[in-house]
Amino acid sequence: MSPRSSTPELKERATVVCRQGQRVLLVARTASRWALPGGTIKSDELPLDAACRELREETGLIALELTYVFQFGGLTKLHHVFVADVPVHAKPQPGMEITRCRWFGHFEVNSLPTSVPTLQIVELLYNRSLVSAEDGSAGQITSPSDTPIE
């Protein structure tokens, strides 16, 4: 928390939505919920660099063109959300702490055990209505042009 505020600062995270048509790639650790690839942005990194690093570490996917689409503010994390259209020949493989890597139809995500931000980000990208969090709140969305990512 900052000394002037009782509100905790949001941790910044690079989140990547990998798409193949109507399918989205989700990853999971052992005995964990499914999630979008991504992770914490290091203090010396730009969000794009963190997104590339996390995607490579978690899925082995490299040299994909990532497009920054929006920021998504959850209760504890600020997600810098990127999209990558993955060629059919690319085969993601679990790496680092990830034990499962799997493609799902975007419509299947709401029936999977996922975090609220994962579900909301996928729904936003596929033009579906934004679902509310369990406490009734929804995430905050900011377009890249509203806030610099440096």
Role assignments for model-derived ranges:
Residues 1-24:
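Conserved N-terminal beta-strand and adjoining loop/helix that marks the start
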Residues 11, 19, 63, 76-79:
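Short connector loops at helix/strand junctions that flank enzyme active sites
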Residues 19-57:
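Conserved Nudix-box catalytic region and its N-terminal flanking loop in Nudix hydrolases
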Residues 41-42, 108-110:
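Short histidine/acidic/glycine/proline-rich micro-motifs that form metal-
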Residues 43-44, 94, 114:
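Residue-level signature of the cytosolic catalytic core of signaling kinases
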Residues 72-108, 117-130:
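Active-site-adjacent beta-strand/loop module that shapes the phosphate/pyrophosphate-binding cleft
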Residues 117-150:
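Charged phosphate-binding loop/patch that engages nucleotide di/tri-phosphates or the phosphate backbone
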